[in-house]
Swiss-Prot record:
InterPro entries, sorted: ARFGAP/RecO (IPR037278), DNA_rep/recomb_RecO_N (IPR022572), NA-bd_OB-fold (IPR012340), RecO (IPR003717), RecO_C (IPR042242)
Family to which this protein belongs: Belongs to the RecO family.
Name this protein carries in UniProt: DNA repair protein RecO
Any GO BP annotation: DNA recombination
Keywords in alphabetical order: DNA damage, DNA recombination, DNA repair
UniProt key word rRNA-binding: no
A GO cellular-component term linked to this record: bacterial nucleoid
Summary of the function given for this chain in its UniProt record: Involved in DNA repair and RecF pathway recombination.
NCBIfam families on file: reco (TIGR00613)
Entry superkingdom: Bacteria
Taxonomic source organism: Cereibacter sphaeroides (strain ATCC 17029 / ATH 2.4.9)
Length: 239
C-alpha cells in the first residue's frame, strides 16, 4: 500500500459516480496530482472542494501508478473571492495555467510556495503585478526563461526597450532600428524597475502569454491557452 500526506491547493473537481469526486491538486512535495475523494459530492464534503481551496491531503493507493484516493481536511477556503470578479478570474487563471503547464506528479516546490502566496494575495488590491511575475516563473518551469539582462544584439545593459518574440531576449532601443514594430515593447515591470502600471502589466502578460502558448503548444494540441486566462486578460484590459 502506497501512502503520503501533503498540503495542496485544489485545481479542479469533477463528479465521479453517484457520490464521489475526482480532484486535481497542486501539492508542495508531490506536484500536480489527481485522486478520488469518496463522498466528494456529498453535502458535507462538496463545499470544501472548491477551486483554490487549500487542503490537508492524505493519498492512498495499492500501487504508485494507480490514481488512488484522497482524504481531505480544509486548511483555507477562498470562497470570499466569489464576490470579486477580478480576484475570482485570477484564481481561475492560476488553477487553469497550473493544470496545463505542470507534468503530473513532478514536484515544483518553489513554484508551489509562490503560487500559494499569489492565491493569498488575490483578496487584496494591487495583485496583478504579482500575477505577471508568477507567469514569468511558470515560463521558467517549462524550461524557457526570458533573458532580459542585456541586449541580444549588442550585449549592452542600457536602454533595453524591446523583447524578441523569437528568442525571448531583450533588445535595446538603438539595436532595434527598423525592426522595432516586430518586437514586443519591454515594460519596466518585467525588469523589476518601479511600480507596475496597468498598461505595463498588460504588456508583460502579452509577452508571457506568447511564450507560454509556444512552449505549451505540444500539450495544447492546437488549442489556445486556457479560457480562464483569456477572461482575466479581458478584465485587466477594462481596469
Amino acid at each position: 500500500m502506497m501512502e503520503w500526506r501533503d498540503e495542496g491547493a485544489l485545481l479542479s473537481v469533477r463528479r465521479h459516480g453517484e457520490s464521489s469526486a475526482i480532484i486535481e491538486v497542486f501539492t508542495a512535495a508531490h506536484g500536480r496530482h489527481a485522486g478520488v475523494v469518496r463522498g466528494g459530492a456529498s453535502r458535507k464534503i462538496a463545499p470544501i472542494l472548491q477551486p483554490g481551496a487549500q487542503l490537508d491531503l492524505t493519498w492512498k493507493a495499492r500501487l504508485d501508478e494507480h490514481m488512488g484516493a484522497f482524504t481531505v481536511e480544509p486548511l483555507r477556503s477562498r470562497t470570499a473571492l466569489l464576490g470579486d470578479r477580478l480576484g475570482l478570474a485570477g484564481l481561475n487563471a492560476i488553477c487553469a495555467m497550473l493544470h496545463v503547464t505542470l507534468p503530473e506528479r513532478e514536484p515544483h516546490s518553489t513554484l508551489w510556495q509562490e503560487s500559494m502566496a499569489l492565491l493569498d494575495a488575490l483578496d487584496r488590491p494591487g495583485w496583478p503585478p504579482a500575477y505577471l511575475r508568477w507567469e514569468m516563473r511558470l515560463l521558467e518551469e517549462t524550461g524557457f526563461g526570458l533573458d532580459l539582462t542585456r541586449c541580444a544584439v549588442t550585449g549592452s545593459r542600457e536602454d533595453l526597450a524591446f523583447v524578441s518574440p523569437k528568442t525571448g531576449r531583450a533588445v535595446s532601443r538603438g539595436a532595434a532600428g527598423g525592426w522595432a514594430d516586430r518586437l514586443f515593447p519591454l515594460p519596466l515591470a518585467l525588469l523589476g524597475q518601479g511600480p507596475a502600471s496597468a498598461e505595463e502589466v498588460r504588456q508583460g502578460l502579452a509577452i508571457t502569454g506568447h511564450f507560454l502558448g509556444r512552449e505549451l503548444a505540444p500539450l495544447l494540441n492546437g488549442r489556445p491557452l486556457p479560457e480562464a486566462r483569456a477572461r482575466l486578460m479581458e478584465l485587466l484590459a477594462r481596469a
